[in-house]
Amino acid sequence: MAKFRVRVSTGEACGAGTWDKVSVSIVGTHGESPLVPLDHLGKEFSAGAEEDFEVTLPQDVGTVLMLRIHKAPPEAPLPLLSFPPDAWYCRWFELEWLPGAALRFPCYQWLEGAGELVLREGAAKVSWQDHHRTLQDQRQKELESRKDMYSWKTYIEGWPHCLDHETVKDLDLNIKYSAMKNAKFFFKAQSAFTELKFKGLLDRTGLWRSLREMKRMFNFHNTPAAEYVFAHWQEDAFFASQFLNGLNPVLIRRCRRLPENFPVTDEMVAPVLGPGTSLQAELEKGSLFLVDHGILSGVQTNVINGKPQFSAAPMTLLYQSPGSGPLLPIAIQLKQTPGPDNPIFLPSDDKWDWLLAKTWVRNAEFSIHEALTHLLHAHLIPEVFALATLRQLPHCHPLFKLLIPHTRYTLHINTLARELLIAPGKVVDKSTGLGIGGFSDLIKRNMEQLSYSVLCLPEDIRARDVGDLPGYYYRDDGMQIWSAIRSFVSEIVDIYYPSDASVRDDQELQAWVGEIFSEGFLSQESSGMPSLLDTQEALVQYVTMVIFTCSAKHAAVSASQFDSCVWMPNLPPSMQLPPPTSKGQASPEGFIATLPAVNATCDVIIALWLLSKEPGDRRPLGHYPDEHFTEEVPRRSIAAFQRKLIQISSGIRKRNQSLALPYTYLDPPLIENSVSI
């Protein structure tokens, strides 16, 4: 006879409790016990409850290895009646055989319908640490089950592969939005559509009548940052600052030599550079910077409301003023091939010529940001990380425990995006200048150029040579967060991987990395993405990159969308007239005629409003309410990580007090753990 106290914790979410009957068997080194019902008077397993059950086994099972949880509908009172099984969210089981001697079995999963679930004791273990055959078999069966549940598909040829489900209705509860988050998301969407339809804007296919009329749209849920954009969008210094701290802060690079297809001369830029210097001198000093949107050259464009749309592939040269002066644009060329029909626009040109040129650059920023920086780098690639984690790492694996909070809701939001945003005829196709055809072109082109170093912030900053560019808060805050994540990851890796050989010998880890390489990066060796990891250092770098991409990188390029775009002339999603081929032709009327139609503007701004702010049920970076790690040592590392994030946040908020436009997108409490919106 063996006696145990079993404590069960049910989640607090809406619908987490169950009327179903739950039984447990205990698996040990000497065998497995019969199923024992967890039952007492009254209802068990209510939402938020922790309940104790006394369990007596007929025989000793030896050292406890795992629990087998069985759930089934209650018996019907009449033979012809039956109860449909309902879902149950279990947080954990705890098994105590002596006072103070207890084992915790983390679950943090929904159990849908009738069936069973196996829970391991909470200590994290890599595969080579499991010596008992029962535990080895359990790891293998768990992964086989998850591979059946979560499979890959090709959505568009040349894109990273994705989850093979058509709609969010097909998803199981473990990867689906909570009921609260889902309700808030769709209420927010419906209220936005209703407001703009009431204003008579949502169905108008014509041009805006004036910038003044656009102000009606601007009042749509604007923010302090959006107010600043509205007040300063025409200013050169603000235009330049958006390359540093706007929604796409990843393109600007130092220019040591002018591209041959960008023939800027000393005479062109002398009014900005001033006397006593030259282009060559400033190139050598390192005070010139380049933003090149050349990947847009020749990209497929869209037709909106029956009208063809247009795109440019601009190059922008910027000058960092000496001392504490601002970064300023000094030359813009709208196409990649120089010639008489491709003038270089300058700040000294007519006001409307220069403003129109800058607006073409901002349209290019929209296209590259939405297709590449946001969709590809901050959604499709994190989906690969999430899906490979579910398929290749069992729950007891330390990397699963570390990474699973950073995959929360990613598969839901990406499936929803394929339903409502990037599917043919949906928002991207209806209302952006490139449409899904142009987005697809860009993603395929970028996949051929994408490198591992671009995903690793320190290497990316070095490659672009922007480590000392003043006022680059994305870099400053991002590097602090990267360092904090890396320190945390390094501590976790040191706990479970004592040597380089232990990394090489972890076959589950190698399968995880290999699947990311093949399914996400399409086995392109030119990307520099590892297909295996053979050192502790390589593992730390790789996992840091995964967590940073899924949290901070996504926050930086997602949360800023609405602020940048609600005043549409600052970030037009499409352009209805071709880029100018000469100077002196621009006018206020021509400027308005170039901007997107009213309905296209509304569609995009609603989408960006939804995608910029989390609709409740948030989990900020470093917030881990699901306690997958049960050992004291990794829990101390988590606490240290959380303290570091608080320190970083304090510094950011202190700095922001002195800024006219605070940079808040990488303030840790505002960063979500995962790509969930």
UniProtKB/Swiss-Prot annotation:
* Chemical reaction(s) catalysed: (5Z,8Z,11Z,14Z)-eicosatetraenoate + O2 = (15S)-hydroperoxy-(5Z,8Z,11Z,13E)-eicosatetraenoate; (9Z,12Z)-octadecadienoate + O2 = 13-hydroperoxy-(9Z,11E)-octadecadienoate; (5S)-hydroxy-(6E,8Z,11Z,14Z)-eicosatetraenoate + O2 = (5S)-hydroxy-(15S)-hydroperoxy-(6E,8Z,11Z,13E)-eicosatetraenoate; (5Z,8Z,11Z,14Z)-eicosatetraenoate + O2 = 5-hydroperoxy-(6E,8Z,11Z,14Z)-eicosatetraenoate
Pfam families on file: Lipoxygenase, PLAT
Listed EC numbers: 1.13.11.33, 1.13.11.-
UniProt keyword terms in alphabetical order: Calcium, Cell junction, Cell membrane, Cytoplasm, Cytoskeleton, Dioxygenase, Iron, Lipid metabolism, Lipid-binding, Membrane, Metal-binding, Nucleus, Oxidoreductase
Residues where Fe cation binds: 374, 379, 554, 677
The listed locations are: Cytoplasm, Cytosol; Cell membrane; Cytoplasm, Cytoskeleton; Membrane
UniProt domain Lipoxygenase: residue ranges: 126-677
Q: Which residues form the PLAT domain?
A: 2-125
Taken from the UniProt entry, a GO cellular component term is:
adherens junction
Cytoplasm recorded as keyword = yes
Q: Which cofactor does it need?
A: Fe cation
SUPFAM superfamilies of this UniProt entry? Answer: Lipase/lipooxygenase domain (PLAT/LH2 domain), Lipoxigenase
Database matches in InterPro entries: LipOase (IPR000907), LipOase_C (IPR013819), LipOase_C_sf (IPR036226), LipOase_CS (IPR020834), LipOase_Fe_BS (IPR020833), LipOase_mml (IPR001885), PLAT/LH2_dom (IPR001024), PLAT/LH2_dom_sf (IPR036392)
Q: List cystine links.
A: none
**Gene3D superfamilies, alphabetically?**
3.10.450.60, Lipoxygenase-1, Domain 5 (1.20.245.10), PLAT/LH2 domain (2.60.60.20)
Q: Which GO terms describe its molecular function?
A: arachidonate 15-lipoxygenase activity; arachidonate 8(S)-lipoxygenase activity; calcium ion binding; iron ion binding; linoleate 13S-lipoxygenase activity; linoleate 9S-lipoxygenase activity; lipid binding
Give a GO biological-process term: negative regulation of cell population proliferation
The biological pathway it contributes to is:
Lipid metabolism; hydroperoxy eicosatetraenoic acid biosynthesis
Which residues does the annotation say bind Ca(2+) 1?
A: 15, 17, 86-87
Q: How is the cofactor bound?
A: Binds 1 Fe cation per subunit.
Residue positions annotated to bind Ca(2+) 2 are 39-40, 42, 44
Q: Read off the domain note.
A: The PLAT domain can bind calcium ions; this promotes association with membranes.
Q: What does this protein do?
A: Non-heme iron-containing dioxygenase that catalyzes the stereo-specific peroxidation of free and esterified polyunsaturated fatty acids (PUFAs) generating a spectrum of bioactive lipid mediators. Inserts a peroxyl group at C15 of arachidonate ((5Z,8Z,11Z,14Z)-eicosatetraenoate) producing (15S)-hydroperoxyeicosatetraenoate/(15S)-HPETE. Also peroxidizes linoleate ((9Z,12Z)-octadecadienoate) to 13-hydroperoxyoctadecadienoate/13-HPODE.
Q: Which family does it belong to?
A: Belongs to the lipoxygenase family.
What protein is this chain from?
Polyunsaturated fatty acid lipoxygenase ALOX15B
Which source organism does the UniProt entry give? Rattus norvegicus
